[in-house]
């Protein structure tokens, strides 16, 4: 089971350089994908900020029903500060890390900062999938 990082979805939604490989990853993992509530909100913020509300609406209609949206348990929020201190990850990444750890998920990402937690959870980088 995979926690798909925000950057994978944004790469496709914003038609960026690696959109084709990211789309293949998303298509290949239908039914095994998890999206954090934080990622969903981040995608919305970025798309709205860039005047792409129509893309967000399409995403919510086409993609969101195919993924499981998960949130960090309330009692684990207190662990985010210690996890940040231990790993050096920023808030976005430490949230993804802790949610993946809680649910026993592998993170699929393009964010090299996740190298810092490879010894704690399974991380797969897009370039290793190609």
Language-model features and meaning:
Residues 1, 66, 70, 101-130:
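Acidic, PIN/NYN-like endoribonuclease modules and their adjacent C-terminal/linker elements
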Residues 1-35, 48-58, 130:
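Short, well-structured N-terminal submotif of metal-dependent ribonuclease cores
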Residues 9, 40, 114-115:
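A generic structural signal for short hydrophobic patches within well-formed alpha-helices
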Residues 13-17, 47, 84, 118-121:
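Short, flexible helix/strand-to-coil boundary loops that buttress conserved ligand/catalytic motifs
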Residues 23-30, 62-64, 98-100, 117:
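Alpha-helix C-terminal capping segments
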Residues 40-68, 75-76:
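Active-site-proximal, substrate-binding regions of enzyme catalytic domains
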Residues 42-43, 79, 116-117:
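Phosphate- and divalent-cation-binding pockets in alpha/beta enzyme and binding domains
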Residues 68-110:
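Active-site neighborhoods of divalent-metal-dependent phosphate/nucleic-acid chemistry enzymes
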